[in-house]
């Protein structure tokens, strides 16, 4: 049905273990990027086959192809998965007329890489990440993240976050479904039992993308919205590489977009993306920066222009020291941009915590006030006015489910599915751009 003279099927396989704390976003985003990686690998195979004069095709289960003609990738995944393995197996197939040797459906037993000293393993990880143009890498002991969680937990766990989903189809009026999420603060062990180390990976947002956002003459916001999405794709690919290296050496691992859980999300045309506060504390714990007053990490070289992902592992890797004021002096004490620029007045009192004797301070954010703007597009100043929306609702003193529902019902019917938002506190920060 796919290639008239087909002779062989080449199946690419991903084996995946779910994290103990996988959010809806993490689950969906992981599946999306894994598909992206499989497709990229499939196209590389096709290009090589075509170099030698063979025809090939992939993506046989996409588009309007009737299901009875789908290639049985899911069936192959069932066959190759060992009975005693609870992991998820994902298969993506290339069909070709090249008469390649047949390997069969039984996977060869994975050869365990000899154990290495922690210093050698970290060197391998860093070398691999640098091949993918990773900007910055740090490691924190899992205990640091637990100590921080214990210090800040009381400031968050009495707070309820409202989660809004649109039940309506595209191009229909917004039909809100609101659920309550009790905020929780996590440690590395919540993501992976017996966690020993947390590897934090950072990628830089291009400075000019930040500098042009919402500024005249173009008042462009699209480039920043694209970076919000694309940087998360690249971060996951980097984290996946680290995960494979660790597991090749016999260690367990889990990927997290926000280890401690202090962050939230920002509205984006390609689905909500982790905001600038996600994994900021993990980055500080890994020695990659100091925590600014607004609650995001500031690095001596890349300033606040970084986004982070974390890999939690039971490998006892060498760790970074925490940066002090001697390493980097922040201007936050003299700055009032956080409260002046926030359109929803989301910043509250300061929270302090100590890591290895180094004190960090930041203002706690009232999550529903912050989400009113950057996540749910109800404040013009955090993005929607630059997309032509005429929606700017003053934030209520007390945000309730009903008030939030009434607000999102005012989303424009046609363009509601393409929100382009940003964190105004970040764009106005002297350390951005």
Q: Model features per residue range: what roles?
A:
Residues 26-115, 210, 215-431:
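Catalytic cores of enzyme domains
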Residues 1-30, 113-222, 227:
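Non-catalytic, usually N-terminal nucleic-acid engagement modules in DNA/RNA processing proteins
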């Amino acid at each position: 049905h796919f290639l008239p003279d087909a002779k062989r099927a080449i199946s690419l396989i991903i084996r995946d273990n779910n994290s103990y704390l996988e959010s809806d976003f993490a689950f969906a985003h992981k599946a999306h990027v894994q598909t992206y990686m499989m497709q990229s690998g499939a196209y590389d195979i096709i290009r090589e086959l075509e170099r030698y004069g063979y025809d090939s095709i992939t993506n046989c289960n996409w588009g309007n192809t009737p299901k009875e003609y789908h290639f049985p990738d899911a069936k192959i995944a069932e066959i190759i998965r060992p009975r005693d393995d609870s992991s998820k197996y994902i298969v993506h197939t290339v069909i070709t007329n090249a008469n390649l040797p047949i390997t069969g459906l039984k996977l060869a037993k994975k050869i365990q890489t000899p154990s290495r000293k922690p210093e050698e393993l970290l060197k391998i990880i860093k070398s691999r990440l640098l091949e993918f143009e990773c900007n910055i890498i740090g490691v924190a002991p899992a205990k640091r993240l637990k100590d921080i969680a214990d210090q800040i937990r009381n400031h968050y766990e009495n707070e309820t976050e409202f989660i809004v989903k649109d039940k309506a189809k595209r191009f229909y009026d917004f039909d809100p479904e609101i659920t309550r999420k009790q905020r929780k603060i996590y440690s590395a062990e919540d993501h992976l039992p017996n966690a020993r180390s947390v590897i934090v990976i950072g990628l830089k947002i291009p400075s000019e993308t930040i500098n042009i956002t919402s500024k005249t003459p173009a008042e462009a916001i699209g480039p920043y919205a694209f970076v919000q999405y694309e940087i998360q794709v690249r971060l996951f690919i980097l984290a996946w590489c680290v995960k494979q290296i660790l597991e090749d050496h016999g260690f367990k691992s889990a990927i997290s977009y926000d280890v401690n859980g202090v962050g939230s999300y920002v509205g984006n045309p390609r689905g909500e993306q982790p905001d600038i506060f996600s994994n900021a504390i993990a980055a500080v714990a890994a020695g990659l920066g100091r925590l600014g007053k607004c609650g995001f990490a500031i690095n001596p070289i890349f300033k606040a222009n970084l986004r982070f992902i974390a890999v939690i592992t039971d490998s006892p890797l060498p760790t970074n020291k925490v940066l002090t004021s001697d390493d980097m002096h922040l201007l936050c004490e003299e700055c009032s941009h956080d409260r002046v620029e926030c359109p929803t007045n989301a910043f509250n009192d300061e929270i302090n915590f100590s890591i290895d004797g180094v004190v960090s301070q930041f203002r706690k954010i009232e999550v529903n006030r912050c989400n009113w703007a950057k996540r749910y597009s109800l404040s013009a100043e955090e993005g929607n006015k630059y997309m032509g929306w005429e929606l700017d609702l003053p934030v209520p003193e007390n945000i309730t489910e009903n008030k939030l529902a009434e607000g999102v019902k005012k989303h424009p019917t046609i363009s509601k599915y393409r929100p382009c938002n940003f964190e105004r506190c970040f764009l106005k920060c002297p350390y951005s751009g």
